[in-house]
A protein has these predicted regions:
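Conserved glycine-rich acetyl-CoA-binding loop
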Residues: 96, 100-114, 121-123, 134-141, ...
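Acetyl-CoA-dependent GNAT
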Residues: 11-17, 22-101, 113-115, 119, ...
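Conserved phosphate-binding and hydrolysis motifs of nucleotide-dependent enzymes
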Residues: 66, 70, 107-109, 147
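Actinobacteria-biased recognition of intrinsically disordered, low-complexity terminal regions
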Residues: 1-5
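C-terminal "cap" of GNAT-fold acetyltransferases
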Residues: 13, 26, 87-92, 126-129, ...
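Bulky hydrophobic/aromatic packing residues
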Residues: 28, 82, 106, 119, ...
């Protein structure tokens, strides 16, 4: 899993926080049309809260020619990336993977996931986890192509919303 040559992956700078927020909200806006209103309200609120949070996470971006194309957060294993809903897993958690609509199909998501895998391995993690839902079909298919497997013991269901499905990539 190596990034496409035209996409640079790096840590987000502090002055890019608002740009990352705007990019992420634009990327996730498509789900408003495919989720139930309750599921969308829950996801939108959770994404906005996570973006505003100062929780310890590595904030990673992908860019080309100085233009942000995508972002992801990588939470350490000691941090509960979803509050009390999912509980803590013993591995890092990839969250808020977002690719600008105009950059889809360029390998940006794959490059960001590859960077999370690289960092998790460097930290000595035995696995890398993530959560997704049936509404996120394109992302789910990409995760499965990259070797992530279902970890249903880490599923959770917010009240009135669709099931949030746990996935894990074994790194050992």
């Amino acid at each position: 899993m190596t990034p496409p040559p035209t996409v640079a992956v790096r840590d987000a700078r502090a002055d890019e926080r608002d740009a990352v927020r705007v990019l992420t909200l634009r990327a996730y806006a498509e789900y408003a049309t495919v989720m139930t209103p309750a599921s969308w309200a829950g996801l939108d609120g959770a994404v906005r809260a996570a973006l505003a949070s100062d929780a310890p996470a590595e904030r990673i971006v992908a860019e080309r020619d100085g233009v942000l194309l995508g972002s992801v957060h990588l939470f350490p294993p000691v941090v509960d990336a979803y509050g009390a809903l999912a509980g803590r897993a013993p591995w890092p958690e990839l969250r808020l993977l977002a690719v600008a609509p105009e950059a889809r199909g360029l390998g940006v998501g794959r490059a960001l996931v590859a960077e999370c895998v690289r960092r998790a391995r460097r930290a000595g993690a035995s696995a890398l986890g993530l959560h997704t839902s049936a509404s996120m079909r394109v992302a789910m298919a990409m995760y499965e192509r990259l070797g992530f497997e279902r970890a249903p013991e880490h599923d959770f269901q917010p009240p009135g919303a669709e099931l949030v499905q746990g996935y894990r990539l074994r790194l050992e």
